[in-house]
Amino acid sequence: MVKLDNVTEGVLDVINDNKFSQTGAFNLRENGTSICHGDSEHIKIKKKTDKPGIDIYIDGKTDGEAVYIPVVLSKSGMTDLVYNDFYVEDGADVRIVAGCGIHNSGCNESRHDGIHTFHVGKNANVRYEEKHYGEGNGTGARVLNPVTNIFVGENSVFTLDTAQIKGVDSTVRETLSLIHISEPT
């Protein structure tokens, strides 16, 4: 288990409702680097080899399980770009808890651009929770720019629950959703 500093623990408590732990399926990204991750029986997380980010594979036997993928930035002047791709098999029922917190006590802008793409199979149920939060007594801006691409299969449900808690100076959100529509019979 990786020992987390007080700033990271405090930010995680806010963006993950005191529920992040280094058990089950999880990946914690801190200051541009994945510092710890774990898999479960039905959820596997793999580091990308061609660009920063992870691929999350959720098998069809997943039933009510949660996966945590928070990001914490605590260095002033940092820009973090990450590509996370989710592959949800037919029939899966999963809760994905993301979120980003920036602690900026410096004078330079800190920024996180998270590009998340969801490939959801048929008859699946996905709940995606994303919270954004900023803190720190510095004058540097706290900027979060999420991009969410959602491709939903037949008879699937995708719930997007996003909140900006406080302390974020600027956000541009982009969301694209393509939903399978059955042909009339």
Named regions from a protein language model:
Residues 185:
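Ser/Thr-centric signal marking residues that sit
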